From Swiss-Prot:
Similarity remark: Belongs to the DNA mismatch repair MutS family.
Binding-site residues for ATP, renumbered to this chain: G665, P666, N667, M668, A669, G670, K671, S672
Lineage summary: Bacteria, Pseudomonadati, Pseudomonadota, Alphaproteobacteria, Hyphomicrobiales
Single GO MF annotation: ATP-dependent DNA damage sensor activity
Domain of life: Bacteria
Source organism: Bradyrhizobium sp. (strain ORS 278)
Pfam families documented for this protein: MutS_I (PF01624), MutS_II (PF05188), MutS_III (PF05192), MutS_IV (PF05190), MutS_V (PF00488)
Record's protein name: DNA mismatch repair protein MutS
GO CC list: cytosol
PANTHER family (alphabetical): DNA MISMATCH REPAIR PROTEIN MSH1, MITOCHONDRIAL, DNA MISMATCH REPAIR PROTEIN MUTS FAMILY MEMBER
Known function: This protein is involved in the repair of mismatches in DNA. It is possible that it carries out the mismatch recognition step. This protein has a weak ATPase activity.
Keywords: ATP-binding, DNA damage, DNA repair, DNA-binding, Nucleotide-binding
Database matches in InterPro entries: DNA_mismatch_repair_MutS, DNA_mismatch_repair_MutS-lik_N, DNA_mismatch_repair_MutS/MSH, DNA_mismatch_repair_MutS_C, DNA_mismatch_repair_MutS_clamp, DNA_mismatch_repair_MutS_core, DNA_mismatch_repair_MutS_N, DNA_mismatch_repair_MutS_sf
A biological-process GO annotation: mismatch repair
Amino acid sequence: MASFRAMTIQQPISVPVPQEATPAEAPAKLTPMMEQYLDIKAAHPGLMLFYRMGDFYELFFEDAEVASKALGIVLTKRGKHQGQDIPMCGVPVERSEDYLHRLIAQGIRVAVCEQMEDPAAARARGNKSVVKRGVVRVVTPGTLTEDNLLDARANNYLLSIARSRGSSGGDRLGLAWIDISTSDFIVTECAFAELTATLARINPNEVIVSDALYSDEAFEPVLRELAAVTPLTRDVFDGATAERRLCDYFAVATMDGLAVLSRLEATAAAACVTYVERTQVGQRPPLAPPAREATGSTMAIDPATRANLELTRTLAGERRGSLLDAIDCTVTSAGSRLLAQRLAAPLTEPAQIGRRLDAVNAFVADSAAREDIRVILRGAPDMTRAMARLSVGRGGPRDLAALRDGILAADQALARLSVLDQPPQEIASVMAALARPARALADEFARALDEQLPLIKRDGGFVRSGYDATLDETRNLRDASRLVVASMQARYADQTGVKALKIRHNNVLGYFVEVTAQHGDKLMSAPLNATFIHRQTLAGQVRFTTSELGEIEAKIANAGERALNLELEIFDRLCAQALAIGDDLRAAAHGFAMLDVATALAKLALDDNYVRPEVDGSLGFAIEGGRHPVVEQSLKREGQPFIANSCDLSPTPGHKSGQLWLLTGPNMAGKSTFLRQNALIALLAQIGSFVPASRARIGIVDRLFSRVGAADDLARGRSTFMVEMVETAAILNQAGERALVILDEIGRGTATFDGLSIAWAAIEHLHESNRCRTLFATHYHELTALAAKLPRLFNATVRVKEWQGDVVFLHEVLPGSADRSYGIQVAKLAGLPPAVISRAKSVLAKLEAADRGQNARALVDDLPLFAVPSRAAVEPAMSKETEELIAAVKDLHPDEMTPREALDALYRLKAKLPAK
């Protein structure tokens, strides 16, 4: 299977080459069809070949063996090659997209080979002629256009990496990524150290690299984490020919009017378009001119932080439960994709963020406009992906209808937005985009397209009657011939005296006369056998034809074929009209997406009581009444409130840098939630969203780091502690004063004093060297003493309350520090056996009474092993008074009591309590 998968240098399939053999041992000669198959296969190494034969795509040799296992289909055989059976399997053409989806999901790339002529044309050339076939497309993870192969709510990016060897500054990399299903095309440059974070942000479905870079050991750890990597020959990444290839793709004479790119960016961009042309086999999907992404224009977030904060997927890999799932109120797939893009790349320019917030605020203030627009958007189709399919010849009548409906929806949305009083800048730009497509095209499509449309254009019947006179005339001829067949059936029934006689049709026999077996002999006997010609005998039926029926069939077939060809010509003409204004249609589609995101975030703000954040260029960070957006929604579904908390990491008087909060408190109290919620509030603010707080002021965060939770990485031989240290090292080495850092329990997983010393040193480094805004949660209570010597360190704790030996979590963050972690109480809540809890308490008491530096052996001697108290000691007998109290409570029926009766019962119970 490896030869088809990503991350493998492309190699031809291992089909034995025919060798000379003596006549006695010569194997059976290959058929012309199999020779054709091997020629096509050899021309497409490293790809699984879907070889069209009639209504099936057939697979042979290793392809068949791999596909059989990957798809769970039956493996059979067809003929022999060099004395060995040729493995074979197949999939129906009509279900091929489903099978392609399953193969792509497993990293298998497929070449689709179609019949390029009708079998009749091959027969006309001679008995041994083979139907001409050719590969019409190569299906790879990054070059998909079909709806059923794509996630409607996510982009499908193909990304290329070009490298320039560096000197003391290290390698520079050019990146280009495109989505041919939406025409997006973006380029940037980055350093090697920034590559992992950049790839995590873009989240490409397929990455192409040169074979030299692919084999470079320095890149191996990066490439290993990617979903699909395809190595290509170096000529694809030839910088000397990059601009020429780009100009050729976009049909321009010079790059000056297209985009200003560095040589590295142009090299990566040219590699992308070259790969697209190869996979689409000569087709050129329309792409937007390459848009250059400025370095530092978005918040840098490394892969570990994205995973820890569960931005788009939970740690279990599910969308549900992620931040994206919590805030996504969009009603279109394009809007959902744009929201995901923004969440992956928060802005770092306050003015841009402000424009997005203005758009959201406009729809917060005008609920009627917001709801009207959302109703219109629900009827707006995904125009960008419809355009992409039409541009590469894979579109159908429903894609034309999508463009028609999209233009009409744009008109409706524009009319509704026009009544807004002084629309903000972003809404004004949306209005300009919605006005670009000409209404005349929608009117033309409305006249041309029928109400009920087939999925595939070859099915015909999609052009409305009355649109084209020639088509109507041809259809009438076809339909009239069918009426003749109906009258012929009645005449034949009278002629034969067989009332059950039927004229039927199938793709093998065409039109035929069918009678039951008991009447078959009658039609095969004189005089009827002069008219009825026997064709086929089945178990219960006998089938015949007549010369008259053959003539009518030819007329029907000819008329039907002419009608279909006329419809296909009309389809091509309509498609050309749409592609001619493709830029206008794509602009309107993007306008829909922007409008959808703005109205969705406004709805979120009103539904969940979010406020507009103040975002500026300072180092401030002041959140009042902040809440975790995901946890709050989860609690709301359960009917429980979320306890809001404030956080202020802004520079204190006399200091330029932000504060470092040291957060102590027990397990389960909400420390990790508090850390995450502040990071998520900053992130939401910088994508241009309102935030879950009563007030928020955010100074731009340029890098976000999170070290919250860790797991083993056994594949790389890393323990949990090692993973934690690697992530912490990245933070200490990379965080600047504009960064926001959240760290949870640094130093756990090793000896107590080792962990404490690591956490101690990390805090000092963050305070003195990184000087960034930081939230640091810990169970090392000794660290709180650092506040005396580190002026920007602030101690905070999560409040709890003890009640009759149990701990009650209040989830309130207050100034101060905790003196204990309540680990045993949490263990009790988790259900540890009472004997274990009791033993743990006695051990803890002894440890706390001892000097921290006391010899460990002496402590063990004082705490003999297995000194577990008896069950009676752990669970003392219940007193008679307690038993009576329990019985009295059980006898109460609160639902049947008045408030006065309930109060009286409470007083009676209190009177029974012991005086002590």
